[in-house]
């Protein structure tokens, strides 16, 4: 059996920007002295006149992006999630969100999988922060195919968009030939009748692997890829609640304010069901190899399998 192809979604981001740049001369890319890490350096090599390095000044970068958007161009402001969503939150809120400017934020190195950089750089709060901003679209793609499609969709959408990418190479689970991305539209990857796993980002592949293990125990798990956290596909959540009555959310993010919280909002108001949230449990991360951290914090396939099995039983 051939080995599954793995690509970090930050690589996908860089490649997608180059392809879009060839088609759209109004696309401008900004970075904050991290072009090699965020992979926007790919765009810089091809279109140096449309790449702006703002230096280690993320707040200023967001302000510059807002100004560029005000002229009618489409800026993609890029940095680590900790800096793009954390350090620059005020500027994203007041300079981009409030005036409803057409700025796209490409946030790489999100979540615990940043690895050795440690807790100060492992942003497990960005989804929570960004989804509170009125009008902000929040997208967390699961793999290379989806990430590229998400960047294209973000460009085409008029208004602020937050794109979340990872440092760790993850399995390519979507077929590029027939994949279709739609903002706010979840994708059912596996049918099931006993429990529904709603996952986002790199946790989609982990959840699919967990579902395979559950099947061996005669537990039928539906797996839904919720790539867009905002606007959330409420219809998919309501349907899952009616179908299985048990929902498990899985995210490489704090269980507070992220995908799990968004799903619970819908369940509480529209579709009563039992829900379990799997994610980072109100704690900071630590330095270590990404794969080991994912396992330690209970976000790997084996951990998901064990938690879902106990939840269903």
Which stretches of residues belong to each language-model region?
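Thiamine diphosphate
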Residues: 1-164, 169, ...
């Amino acid at each position: 059996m051939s080995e599954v192809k793995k690509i970090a979604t930050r690589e996908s981001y860089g490649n997608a920007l180059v392809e879009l740049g060839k088609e759209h001369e109004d696309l401008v890319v900004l970075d904050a002295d991290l072009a090699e890490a965020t992979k926007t350096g790919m765009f810089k090599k091809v279109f140096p006149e449309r790449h702006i390095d703002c230096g280690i000044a993320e707040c200023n970068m967001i302000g510059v992006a807002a100004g560029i958007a005000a002229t009618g161009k489409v800026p993609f402001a890029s940095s680590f999630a900790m800096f793009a969503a954390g350090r620059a939150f005020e500027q994203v809120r007041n300079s981009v969100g409030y005036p409803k400017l057409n700025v796209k934020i490409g946030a790489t190195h999100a979540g615990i999988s940043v690895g050795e950089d440690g807790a100060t750089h492992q942003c497990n709060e960005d989804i929570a922060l960004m989804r509170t901003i009125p009008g902000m679209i929040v997208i967390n793609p699961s793999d290379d195919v989806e990430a590229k499609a998400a960047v294209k969709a973000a460009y085409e959408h008029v208004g602020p968009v937050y794109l979340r990418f990872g440092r760790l190479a993850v399995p390519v689970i979507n077929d590029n030939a027939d994949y279709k991305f739609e903002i706010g539209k979840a994708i059912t990857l596996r049918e099931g009748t006993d429990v529904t796993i709603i996952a986002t980002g790199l946790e989609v592949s982990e959840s699919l692997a967990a579902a395979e293990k559950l099947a061996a125990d005669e537990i039928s798990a539906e797996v839904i890829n919720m790539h867009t956290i905002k606007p959330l596909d409420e219809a998919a959540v309501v349907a899952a609640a009616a179908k299985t009555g048990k929902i498990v959310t899985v995210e490489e993010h704090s269980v507070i304010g992220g995908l799990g919280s968004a799903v619970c909002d819908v369940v509480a108001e529209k579709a009563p069901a039992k829900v379990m949230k799997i994610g980072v449990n109100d704690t900071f991360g630590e330095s270590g190899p990404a794969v080991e951290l994912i396992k330690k914090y209970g976000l790997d396939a084996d951990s998901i399998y064990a938690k879902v099995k106990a939840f269903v039983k």
